[in-house]
Amino acid sequence: MGLYATCLSNGPPVLRDATVDSTLVSELQERIEEKRETITVVPGEGNVLGVWGYLGDLYAFRNKTGNVTAGMYKATSSGWTEIDLGLALNFDGTTGNGEMVIGSLLTGAGGAQGTVAGLTYYGNWDVGAEGTVVLSDVTGTFVTDETLSTPTISFDAGTVEILQGDTITGSTSGKTAVVKIITIASGGWATDDAAGYLSITGNTGTWTDGESILVYGAARADVDGATEPSSKTLAYAYGTQYAQTLQPGGKYDFVNFNFEGEEGIQTMYGANGIDNSFEFDGTNFTKIRTGITSADTPSYVEAYKNHLFLGYTNGSLISSSLQLPTIMSTTMGSTELIVGEGVTGLNVESKDSLAVFARNTTYILYGKSRDDWNLTTFYTGSGAVDGTVQKIHTTIFLDDRGLTSLGSTLNYGDFKQSIISEKVDPLIQKYKARIKTALRVREKNQYRLYFDDKTGIAMTFINGKNEGIMPFTMLDQIICACSTEDSNGDEVLYGGFDDGYVRRLDSGTSYDGGSVAAFVRLAYFHYGTPQLKKRFREILLELTADTSTTLNIYPDFNYGDGTVPTSTAYDITVTDDEWNVDDVSNSSLGIAVVDKARARIQGVGENMGILIKNTSIYDKPVTLQGAVIQYSDRGLKR
C-alpha cells in the first residue's frame, strides 16, 4: 500500500511512493477535486424523483423546469442526456384482421406511416380493444378516426398450429417472415380448416396464392390471396399523434425482467403513483394502459410468474397477460385482484409466491396464472410503511411494531413474521412517519432506512441474523436510492438527492467533497472488578487502515456520572498497513497484518468507556480490531 499509479502527459504510467514523494498525496487530492467539478446535476428542478440501473447504464427522473412535466435522463461520460420518449398514437375499434406487432409498418388512411416500436392495450383485440401504439420513423401526421392498417398474411386450410415466433417459408415463392401474432377468423387447427391472419415482421416479398406455408419444412396452412401480405385495417386512430410526456412528481418504483425467455434480454419497468406505468427497452418508451378508468396510476411494479404486476393505492392489483407485460387482455391471462387497501409494496418470495403489502395487512399470492391465482390474507394488523419493503435473505419492511422480517418456515408455502428492531424501538417509532426511502445492500448484507432529516439507520445481517443497527448522518438529503449492477456485474449503490444530484453511495472518502465525521463509542467496562478503583494508563488500539490518519480518543470514567474529572482528549496517529490481497497466498508473510496505535492516558475510575472520533475528507476507512487497556488497581470504592 502507499503506491499509486499516475499518468504523465509526457510518458507512460510510473509508480510513485507516497512515503518518499511529498507531493503525491496533494496531487491525488487535486485530481479528485478536478473530477468532482465535472459532475453535473440532473437537468430540471426539485428532487430527483427516481434513480435506477438498467443494462449497465444509470437513469434518473426529475421534474423539468417549470414543473409541467418530468424528464427521464441517462448518465453518460459527458453528463446527463434526456431520453426522447417518442411519438404515440391512441387507438380503438380493433378488428379481427390481425394485430399490430413490434417492427411492423403502420399506415394511416391519410398516408402517414410509422414503424411500431411499442404497443399496449386493454381488452380483447378481436372484439374491440383500446390502447396506444408507439411509433418511430414517422412520416406525415396520423389524425383522429382514420383507419390504421398493417400488412398481414391471410391463410386457410390450416392443419398444424403455427406458433408465435415461428419462421415461415413459402413453398413456391421461397419468401420468409417471422410470425408474431396468429388470429383465427374461422375453423380450427383440430378440424384441419383453420383460417385467419398472421401478423408478421421481417417479410421478404410477395407470397404466391395457395402455396403452402412451411415451418421447419412441414406444411402448416395455405396462403389465401394473390398479393399477400396485404394491408388490412386493424384499428382506428383515437386522436392525433402526440409526443409522450411524464407527469411531474411522484415516487418511482422499478423492476428489470426478461419476459421473452431469451438470454440477456431484459426490459425496465417502472411506476410512480401519478402516471401510467411504463416499459423501456433502452430505446423505446411505452406507457402501459390497463383500462382502469378512475386513475391508471400504479405505485408499485413487480414481475412474477412471467406476468407484470401493478399495485395501486385504490387497492387494485393487476396482472398483465402471460409473457406480455404491456397487454391487459383477459383471453391472454390478464386479471385484476382486489386487495381492499392501498398497496404499499410488492416482493417475490422464495416459495412460488408474491407478497403483497398494504399499510395494515399482509397478503400472499399463490399460483401461476389467472386460472389458479389465490390471494390469501397472511396477517391482519401488520403491514408495511410505504416504500420500506426490501429483499435481502428474507423480506424486510417497516411496520407499526418496528422493522419486521417475513421469512419462510419449514412447511412449504408457510411464512412467519418476527420483529427485529426491539432494541431501538424508540428510534423506529420516532421516524416511522418520516421515511424517505429504503435500500438493500447485498455486499454488506444490510437493510437501510433513510429519514427526512439527513439521518438513517443501517441493519447488518450475518448468517441471516441481525447483528446490529447503526444510526448514521449524511450531509445531503436523500430522496430515492437503488442497488443495481454495473457492466461487470458488481453491485453499485446510487442515491437521488433533493439538490438534483445523483450520488454513488458507499464510494470515495467524503460526502461529495464534504468532510465525514465518524465516531464509535465502546461500552463501559469494569474489567471484572466493578467495585475496585483503577488507574488507567494506556489504550492500545489494534487497527487495519488503508491510509494514514489521526484518531481522537476520549476516555470516560464511571459511566460519565461526573464523580471524576472529565478526561483529556488524546490523538493517535494511524499508519496504513502493508497487507494486501497478494499476501493471501504467501506461505511466509513477513509483514504486519494488524497495526497497533497507543495513547498514554491518565484517569481513575471503577470503569471506563472509550469514544473514538475522526473527521476527514480524504482518509479511507479504519477498521478497529480490538482495544487493549493497561491499568493498575487502586483499592475498593468506599
Predicted segments, located by residue:
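Beta-sheet repeat architectures centered on beta-propellers
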Residues: 1-86, 246-263, 380-394, 401, ...
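Beta-propeller and closely related beta-pinwheel folds
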Residues: 39-47, 84-87, 241-247, 284-439, ...
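Recurrent small/Gly-Pro-centered beta-turn motifs in extracellular repeat architectures
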Residues: 62-64, 272, 312, 358, ...
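Autoprocessing Asn-cyclization modules and mimics
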Residues: 73, 79-241
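Acidic/polar residues in short coil/turn loops that connect beta-strands
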Residues: 76, 110, 173, 238, ...
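Extracellular/lumenal ectodomain signal focusing on beta-strand-rich modules
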Residues: 144-147, 209-212, 287, 477, ...
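Hydrophobic or amphipathic alpha-helical targeting/insertion segments
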Residues: 258-288
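Structural hallmark of WD40 beta-propellers
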Residues: 266, 352-353, 491
